[in-house]
Amino acid sequence: MNITGVIVEYNPFHNGHLYHLNKTKEITDCDGIVAVMSGHFVQRGSPALLDKWTRAKLALLNGVDLVLELPTIYSTSSAEFFAYGATSLLDGINIVNNLCFGSELGNIDIILKTSKILQEEPLSFKEDLKNFIDKGISFPNAREKALINFMRKGKNSFDFNNVLCLSNNILALEYCKNLFKINSNIKPFTVKRQGSHYNCLHLRDNLSSATAIREYIGNNENLDNLVKSVPETVLNMLKNFQNEQCKFPFEEDMFTYIKHKYFSNTGSIENLPDVSEGIHNRIYRALDTCNTLKEAMDMIKTKRYTYTRIKRILCHYFIGMDMINSDELRRKPCPYARILGFNRKGQDILKLIKKSSNIPIINKIPKKIDSTLNLDINATKCYSLLNKKVNPLDDFLKKPVLK
């Protein structure tokens, strides 16, 4: 079988995702699609709108054949570790031929060329990167400036301005960089992103961004206006959730629990992997004085620490990453493939995986639980505080979704 992998969050699944899946099938001519999907918390440090089993079900209803969970240690990390965890998982199951991802660039040759530079870090690039960081510039901006300088020295005709400031391009580069890093045989493909850019806050008829859809859901009770933005299956699921008088979980909902943990002297923000240069002191001052997450992030923000990085740190604190050696864990390849759901074709793919995989396949929680899986279990417990439809022990109680 010719199997293609996709790396996703589906928060929530929308028409842009459907377009990506259809184009993926077209350009890779694949027999099946395996999705590696974030669990209950996503890459920007937020809780997912719907639980991971519901999102897996929606993925299966809209073209995916097998959904595997990206462990929380990677799913809530920066693009580098997010991509490393996902690509190492796809490589580890040893049956994936292709990886297809969206990008604003839409040019796989330029993405591969650029990712090779980021992986090898030539001396002049490395020196420029260090100089920009020493000036107090955030890592993402410093890397973009260093790349532009390096490309100019090489007299490249392509304009690299803004390549590294667009969300899907950043992830695309990290996917390819990590495929090089792990010496994978998986062949990368890209689909040019259509419609609104990732951070657009306004609904567009057919291809609204996930950000715009979440923004709308957070501010409106009438979900009918999403009819042109998401497939019918997704809209029905969102309405069902709302009709059961459940509140959609958002990052702001974490703040009360974060403050409670801090005031209880439980854990330590200094132990988190992305905390350095005394930023924890700014965080502690914000927790002492602020009443909302937004107010706290505004107070903590510095030139080097972006809003996303701060939110990610607070999310890590909320789900208990300060209690483990999370930096060591996220630098290791994904240790298992946990099944969230599959259809009949996915069942055939699973048979191939079980014969070929280099990593364990998990469909129910084993007796022996390692630190990575234990964090996933703890993330579900924390998520259940925000989404009342989720039981704290659902990781033990729920079976993979079968469609």
From Swiss-Prot:
GO cellular component: cytoplasm
UniProt GO molecular function: ATP binding; ligase activity, forming carbon-nitrogen bonds; tRNA binding
Calcium among keywords: no
Sorted UniProt keywords: ATP-binding, Cytoplasm, Ligase, Nucleotide-binding, RNA-binding, tRNA processing, tRNA-binding
Catalysed reactions, semicolon-separated: cytidine(34) in elongator tRNA(Met) + acetate + ATP = N(4)-acetylcytidine(34) in elongator tRNA(Met) + AMP + diphosphate
Xref: Pfam families: HIGH_NTase1
EC number(s) on file: 6.3.4.-
Domain of life of the native organism: Bacteria
Location of the protein in the cell: Cytoplasm
Record keyword Transmembrane helix present: no
Principal place of residence: cytoplasm
Enzyme class: ligase
Membrane spanning stretches: none
Residues bound to ATP: 7-20, 102, 168, 193
InterPro entries (UniProt xref): Rossmann-like_a/b/a_fold (IPR014729), tRNA(Met)_cyd_acetate_ligase (IPR008513)
A GO BP entry: tRNA modification
NCBIfam families: PRK13670.1
Annotated function: Catalyzes the formation of N(4)-acetylcytidine (ac(4)C) at the wobble position of elongator tRNA(Met), using acetate and ATP as substrates. First activates an acetate ion to form acetyladenylate (Ac-AMP) and then transfers the acetyl group to tRNA to form ac(4)C34.
Family from the record: Belongs to the TmcAL family.
Protein's UniProt name: tRNA(Met) cytidine acetate ligase
Gene coding for it: tmcAL
